[in-house]
């Protein structure tokens, strides 16, 4: 059975400026869930753990991102096509005068999205959580769920100033993490608040509630 996409669509005008809309996003999330569930079902049938328990979380994020980017292109009515693996940006615009190329960045739970270089451009950031088989989120480190659900999508333009550069010894090479100002510059376009990895008594959760109450 296909998983239902739950969540609130926001900032539709911003999505339209970059060549997308809420229907495209909804269908892309749905296709991503459907494919991930098929992969998990095949793995389990062969006596293998689900994908989220078979690969490291960094690799899982990359896999989900690649699937979601392809799904966005599939449902974009020809406005975008998927770029090759490990190539920037992820989504190539069919008409750059009408709407820009888009880069997709993934992150688990409340982590800030990151890449290897601080490249100015238009971004979609996707943050997800791991839930149990009933779709209930499990955030405890070492006791996370097995099924990925997207809880937040953001969209907007990022400049070099919106990244924090790290090149410390022991790090996984040079990294560029979206900083606080960058997260503010990116506007929420999809929010599944019931699966947000936040304390419902906290300030951040209250800010998300206010965002939902304000509407699109």
Spell out what each predicted region is.
Residues 1-89, 106-216:
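Nucleic-acid endonuclease domains
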Residues 92-101:
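Active-site beta-strand-loop-beta-strand hairpin of nuclease catalytic cores
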């Amino acid at each position: 059975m296909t998983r239902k996409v739950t969540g609130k669509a926001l900032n539709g005008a911003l999505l339209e400026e970059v060549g997308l809309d809420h229907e495209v996003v909804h269908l892309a999330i749905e296709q991503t869930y459907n494919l991930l569930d098929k992969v998990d079902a095949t793995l389990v049938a062969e006596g293998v753990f689900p994908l989220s328990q078979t690969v490291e979380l960094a690799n899982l994020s990359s896999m989900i991102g690649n699937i979601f980017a392809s799904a966005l292109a599939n449902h974009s009515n020809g406005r975008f096509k998927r770029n090759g693996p490990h190539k920037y940006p992820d989504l190539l615009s069919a008409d750059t005068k009408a709407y820009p190329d888009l880069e997709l960045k993934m992150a688990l739970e409340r982590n800030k999205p990151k890449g290897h270089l601080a490249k100015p451009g238009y971004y979609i950031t996707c943050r997800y959580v791991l839930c149990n088989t009933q779709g209930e989120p499990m955030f405890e480190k070492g006791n996370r769920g097995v099924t990925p659900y997207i809880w937040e999508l953001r969209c907007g333009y990022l400049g070099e100033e919106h990244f924090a550069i790290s090149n410390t010894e022991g790090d996984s090479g040079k990294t560029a993490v979206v900083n606080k100002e960058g997260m503010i510059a990116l506007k929420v376009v999809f929010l599944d608040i019931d699966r947000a990895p936040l304390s419902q008594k906290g300030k951040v959760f209250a800010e998300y509630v206010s965002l939902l109450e304000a509407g699109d």
